[in-house]
């Protein structure tokens, strides 16, 4: 099932998401639906709050990057906790399915260690670096109620204010179905 993607301005995007209790929902189906939604929108990651679910879960697929230095990773992260981030912060022009048409440089540490459960409720602790770490950090921010634009300087935020307001009203171009917080 392809979910509509929640647009900038929806309160669910600014909430700290809730842990998922084992057995409380079908995480295998939810993961499959989130991957289908992400792929339909040509994304590399999608967090549950972006499909209006206030839950600590996200999916990533870095195989879409055409770069031999990036090891493809396709995973579901349930109740993740970033235990440590380290390394030099580096900029990359990020975008977000909830904020179509807006991109900006965000600085993030190069490495991380994360603890999470998979869809079989097996616990993992793994380290990631480079672009995969960045995608995880971006999606993790979503379950913490943080958007990539929150990392920008106040000047850049002011410059984007009109565009962000328009997105919240549905005045944007997206090739996928979206849910807008403010009706036109």
Curated annotation (Swiss-Prot):
<dbReference type="InterPro" id="IPR036821">
    <property type="entry name" value="Peptide_deformylase_sf"/>
</dbReference>
<comment type="function">
    <text>Removes the formyl group from the N-terminal Met of newly synthesized proteins. Requires at least a dipeptide for an efficient rate of reaction. N-terminal L-methionine is a prerequisite for activity but the enzyme has broad specificity at other positions.</text>
</comment>
<keyword id="KW-0378">Hydrolase</keyword>
<dbReference type="GO" id="GO:0046872">
    <property type="term" value="F:metal ion binding"/>
</dbReference>
<feature type="binding site">
    <location>
        <position position="138"/>
    </location>
    <ligand>
        <name>Fe cation</name>
    </ligand>
</feature>
<dbReference type="GO" id="GO:0043686">
    <property type="term" value="P:co-translational protein modification"/>
</dbReference>
<keyword id="KW-0408">Iron</keyword>
<feature type="binding site">
    <location>
        <position position="142"/>
    </location>
    <ligand>
        <name>Fe cation</name>
    </ligand>
</feature>
<comment type="similarity">
    <text>Belongs to the polypeptide deformylase family.</text>
</comment>
<dbReference type="InterPro" id="IPR023635">
    <property type="entry name" value="Peptide_deformylase"/>
</dbReference>
<feature type="binding site">
    <location>
        <position position="96"/>
    </location>
    <ligand>
        <name>Fe cation</name>
    </ligand>
</feature>
<dbReference type="GO" id="GO:0006412">
    <property type="term" value="P:translation"/>
</dbReference>
<keyword id="KW-0479">Metal-binding</keyword>
<dbReference type="GO" id="GO:0042586">
    <property type="term" value="F:peptide deformylase activity"/>
</dbReference>
<keyword id="KW-0648">Protein biosynthesis</keyword>
<protein>
    <recommendedName>
        <fullName>Peptide deformylase</fullName>
        <ecNumber>3.5.1.88</ecNumber>
    </recommendedName>
</protein>
<dbReference type="Pfam" id="PF01327">
    <property type="entry name" value="Pep_deformylase"/>
</dbReference>
<feature type="active site">
    <location>
        <position position="139"/>
    </location>
</feature>
């Amino acid at each position: 099932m392809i979910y509509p993607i929640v647009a900038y301005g929806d309160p669910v995007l600014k909430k700290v998401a809730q842990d998922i209790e084992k057995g409380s929902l079908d995480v295998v189906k939810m993961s499959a639906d989130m991957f289908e939604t992400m792929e339909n929108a040509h994304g590399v990651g999608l967090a549950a709050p972006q499909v209006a679910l206030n839950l600590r879960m996200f999916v990533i697929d870095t195989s879409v990057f055409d770069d031999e230095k990036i090891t493809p990773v396709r995973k579901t992260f349930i109740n993740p906790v970033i235990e440590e981030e380290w390394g030099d912060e580096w900029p990359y022009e990020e975008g977000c399915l909830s904020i179509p048409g807006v991109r900006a440089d965000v600085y993030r540490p190069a490495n991380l260690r994360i603890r999470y459960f998979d869809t079989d409720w097996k616990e993992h602790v793994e380290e990631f670096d480079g672009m995969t770490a960045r995608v995880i950090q971006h999606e993790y921010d979503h379950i913490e109620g943080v958007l990539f634009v929150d990392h920008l300087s106040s000047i850049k935020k002011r410059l984007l204010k009109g565009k962000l307001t328009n997105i919240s009203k549905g005045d944007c171009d997206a090739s996928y179905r979206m849910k807008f917080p403010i009706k036109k």
